From Swiss-Prot:
Naturally occurring in which organism (per UniProt): Kluyveromyces lactis (strain ATCC 8585 / CBS 2359 / DSM 70799 / NBRC 1267 / NRRL Y-1140 / WM37)
GO BP field: small GTPase-mediated signal transduction
Protein name: GTP-binding protein Rho1
Chain positions recorded as GTP binding sites: 19-26, 66-70, 124-127
Key word Nucleotide-binding present: yes
Compartment(s) of residence: Cell membrane
Residues that bear Cysteine methyl ester: 205
């Protein structure tokens, strides 16, 4: 849950969250910004929230930009990227394909529109990693929930500044995600580390 700050925040930062549809992005934002877990899944088109966060003695007004992960919105989603200070790339721990798409789709899109902007990889739905039903359903497909080691390897490959797991349903790790994101947004753009991907061509934040 976001930490309320009495005075008006003197620092403003923009956070954009991306990832496959239904991977848990919107629930994560709602739990942090509003303190409640939505019981009904409604696919996001675009939505914005604002949360006041205090980290390391600094007050920050964090604008939270939610996006749609469905392919239908691939041409519209880039409108959210300009002026971003930090990007959360999310995947769902119970959906191995969603982690594969971090490498296959999301990192190249983020690098294309937001060169140098700090990236945090977020593993959503951590409560499902050991859920018996989820484990059994994945086993029937020859799969298993994503392990921390697998996700950390992807985080390293894409040049993420951090990897954090969370569960919007239980509240586990939610505050840590946004505190880490706020700190990363205050550091500013990076120019030293390059993600180990085929997409080496990057552009500044632009709008299609």
């Amino acid at each position: 849950m976001s930490q309320a700050v009495g005075n008006v925040a003197s620092i403003r930062r923009k956070l954009v969250i991306v990832g496959d549809g239904a991977c848990g992005k919107t629930c994560l934002l709602i739990v942090f910004a509003k303190g409640k877990f939505p019981q009904v899944y409604v696919p996001t088109v675009f939505d914005n929230y604002v949360a006041d966060v205090e980290v390391d003695g600094r007050r920050v007004e964090l604008a939270l930009w939610d996006t749609a992960g469905q392919e239908d919105y691939d041409r519209l989603r880039p409108l959210s990227y300009p002026d971003s200070n930090v990007v959360l790339i999310c995947y769902s721990i119970d959906l191995p394909d969603s982690l594969e798409n971090v490498m296959e789709k999301w990192i190249s899109e983020v690098l294309h529109f937001c060169q140098g902007v700090p990236i945090i990889l977020v593993g959503c739905k951590a409560d499902l990693r050991n859920d018996p039903q989820v484990v059994e359903e994945l086993r029937a497909q020859g799969l298993q929930p994503v392990s921390q080691a697998q996700a950390q390897e992807v985080a390293d490959q894409i040049g993420a500044v951090d990897y954090i797991e969370c569960s919007a349903k239980t509240g586990y790790g939610v505050r840590e995600v946004f505190e880490a994101a706020t700190r990363a947004s205050l550091v500013g753009k990076q120019g030293k580390s390059k993600p180990k991907t085929k997409s080496s061509k990057k552009k500044k934040c632009v709008v299609l």
